[in-house]
A protein has these predicted regions:
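Histidine/acidic residue-rich metal-binding segments in metalloenzymes
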Residues: 39-188
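Metal-associated gating/positioning segment near the N- to mid-region
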Residues: 1-16
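A glycine-rich helix N-cap at a beta->alpha junction
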Residues: 12-26
Length: 188
């Protein structure tokens, strides 16, 4: 998330690595409603690029305390800062507001948090959370010309949005995970 953390990780990994590796830099947001949230790291992005990170990644929904959620203002700012360097910015796309509301609904009905029950998790992280966040991130790429990678696309509808953006000529890439192609919620 900053040069100090990069140097710490690089020092630890370099001593024990027998293979070539690269580190991604984190894009850290500043959502106020996340417990223990740190301020965004927009001021550190250029230094991280100069350190040699392979790319950057941010999360549009919570992913634990280490990677506070980015909002669309953070996404746009990061793309603006990193565009002159041609840096790739990856985003794990799930629209945070929808996730929060759906988690509240699930907890009110069942008394559980979404992490306690797979069905509740799937309901609160449905395709629409991914679709809306992906469209928003693509719009920020459109606004800035910054290079974007959509991480872990999980639904054909989202893949189509990415495909349309690529055909439009936007600098967008995406990938999926093997288990998204082979497993259904029944298997989980």
């Amino acid at each position: 998330m900053n040069k100090e953390i990069f140097d710490l990780k690089m020092g630890r990994i370099s001593k024990h690595s027998y293979v070539d590796f690269a580190l991604w830099g984190g894009i850290v947001g500043d959502y106020d409603n996340q417990p223990g949230s740190v301020k965004n790291n927009m001021a550190d992005l250029v230094d991280l690029h100069k350190c040699g990170v392979a790319a950057f990644k941010g999360f549009t929904c919570p992913n634990g305390d280490l990677f506070p959620t980015v909002n669309m203002g953070n996404v746009r700012k990061a793309l603006e800062i990193l565009k002159p360097y041609g840096a790739l910015c990856g985003f794990h796309c799930e629209e945070f507001g929808q996730v929060l509301e759906r988690e509240k609904e699930a907890k009110a009905k069942t008394g559980r948090t979404s992490e306690e029950k797979i069905r509740d998790f799937l309901d609160s992280h449905d395709v629409w959370t991914e679709y809306v966040a992906t469209k928003n991130v693509i719009d920020m790429a459109r606004a800035t010309g910054g290079r974007v990678h959509i991480c872990h696309v999980s639904h054909p509808m989202v893949a189509q949005v990415v495909k349309d953006a690529i055909h439009e000529g936007l600098p967008i890439t995406a990938e999926t995970c093997p288990h998204y192609l082979g497993f259904t919620e029944d298997f989980v």
